[in-house]
């Protein structure tokens, strides 16, 4: 199983939430997009345990199963298609999450998230 981990599920994993731990341990390949890294680090910067959180993230990123995922030109086309679809449906989602969805679809990944607004994208497999 190849997954893209959203920030809320990464946090769940770090807190030992059983489903998050199970899914992440079972995954053959774990993608973490640059947007999620930005969200996490923004949270770290505002918190009291930024150094500890950064160390934990670094250990996670150093796992051979974890790869960082970046946007490219194909991602921008996927983003535009999704933006149009959601606008037409009248169901916009936050910009960061739209980028996350575009990356997951582009790379044929299961999105591991707790955010239910991704349900507005039936073509996006979510766990």
List where the protein language model places each region.
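Conserved beta-strand segments of alpha/beta enzyme cores
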Residues: 29, 65-67, 125
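Short, well-structured N-terminal submotif of metal-dependent ribonuclease cores
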Residues: 1-35, 45-59
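Histidine- and aromatic-rich ligand-binding microenvironments
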Residues: 6, 32-33, 92-94, 115
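Active-site neighborhoods of divalent-metal-dependent phosphate/nucleic-acid chemistry enzymes
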Residues: 67-112
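A general structural signal for well-ordered alpha-helical segments in protein cores
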Residues: 37, 53-57, 76-79, 97
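Acidic, PIN/NYN-like endoribonuclease modules and their adjacent C-terminal/linker elements
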Residues: 1, 101, 105-127
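Generic structural signal for small/hydrophobic residues in well-ordered secondary structure
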Residues: 6-7, 40, 79, 104
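A generic structural signal for short hydrophobic patches within well-formed alpha-helices
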Residues: 10, 37-40, 118
């Amino acid at each position: 199983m190849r997954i893209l981990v959203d920030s809320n599920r990464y946090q769940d994993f770090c807190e030992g939430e059983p489903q998050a731990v199970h899914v992440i341990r079972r995954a053959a390949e774990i993608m973490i997009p640059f947007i999620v890294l930005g969200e996490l680090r923004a949270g770290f910067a505002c918190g009291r345990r930024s150094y500890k959180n950064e160390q934990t993230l670094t250990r996670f990123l150093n796992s051979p199963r974890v790869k960082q995922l970046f946007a490219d030109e194909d991602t921008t086309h996927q983003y535009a298609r999704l933006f149009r679809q959601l606008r037409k449906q009248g169901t916009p989602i936050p910009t960061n999450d739209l980028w996350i969805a575009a990356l997951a679809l582009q790379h044929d990944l299961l999105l591991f998230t707790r955010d239910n607004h991704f349900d507005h994208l039936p073509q996006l497999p979510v766990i």
